[in-house]
Design a protein with these regions (language model features):
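Active-/binding-site microenvironments in catalytic and ligand-binding cores
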Residues: 1-247
Length: 247
């Protein structure tokens, strides 16, 4: 089982690790800072650098398709893996700019949930945009929601996480905002669920990476609102600052 360092500290950009498996799915490490695709958030990219200096690009990160609890680091198709075998010690480093964008957008989607009190019917978080689909038929105002996000960002509210028991979650079903995806239950068998809290604004199960304070979300605005169906309104978020100003 991969030790998921990002669960407790999303600000980590690198760690030392040892390869425990290499198969058709990718490279598996004993520990990692790479977040795998999940909860609507894209997987991390970055590099693995072996002790001898060999470097392997990682273009995506996923949960292992057949080994529960393991994370696979996916190299480009056809990449040479000669220097990366079981037992190789290395430094795993994520693309920090890409991760930071994921963290800002993911926290911003929780601010959306605070502003739009309806169930979530879909989610996607990338380095260039984020979107949430809300189960509702009422119209939404783009400028009003952008202003609400800006207000919560300006409030500089602390963002934290904690673990609750699965029994506690089951006793409080209103914590779950997603209609289609169930909260990530612990694969360790400990029977616990990770909960994200934005002080005074949002509290819900979430396994993603987030900033530590809403002020760090920065200039995020609503770029589009779409009526996807009679009961679905899609809200798309984007950065208001130029790409070179991010990091």
């Amino acid at each position: 089982m991969t030790d998921e360092l990002f669960r407790e500290d999303a600000s980590l950009v690198e760690c030392t690790a040892t390869i425990v498996a290499v198969d058709e799915a990718g490279v598996v490490l004993d520990r990692t800072v790479f977040y795998p695709l999940g909860g609507g958030q894209a997987g991390d990219a970055g590099t693995l650098t072996a002790e001898g200096g060999a470097q392997l690009q990682i273009v995506d990160t996923r949960k292992h398709p057949t080994q529960p609890g393991e994370i696979v680091h996916i190299p480009p198709a056809g990449a040479f893996l000669g220097g990366f075998t079981v037992g190789t010690k290395l430094v795993a480093r994520i693309d920090a700019v890409r991760r930071r964008a994921h963290m800002r957008f993911h926290t911003a989607t929780h601010l959306l949930c605070a502003l739009i009190p309806h169930p979530v019917d879909g989610c996607s978080i990338t380095a260039s945009y984020a979107r949430l689909d809300f189960h509702m038929n009422e119209p939404l105002d783009k400028e009003q929601i952008s202003a609400g996000i800006a207000r919560l960002v300006k409030d500089a509210r602390p963002v934290s996480h904690r673990w609750i028991s699965e029994a506690e979650l089951d006793a409080n079903p209103a914590l779950v905002r997603s209609m289609r995806v169930q909260p990530p239950r612990s694969e360790s068998g400990l029977g616990r669920v990770r909960v994200l809290e934005i002080e005074g604004a949002d509290l819900q199960p979430c396994g993603g990476t987030h900033v530590a304070n809403t002020a760090e979300v920065g200039a995020v605005i609503v770029t589009k609102i779409e009526k996807k169906s009679a009961m679905t309104r899609r809200v798309v978020l984007g950065f208001a600052e130029p790409a070179e100003g991010r990091g």
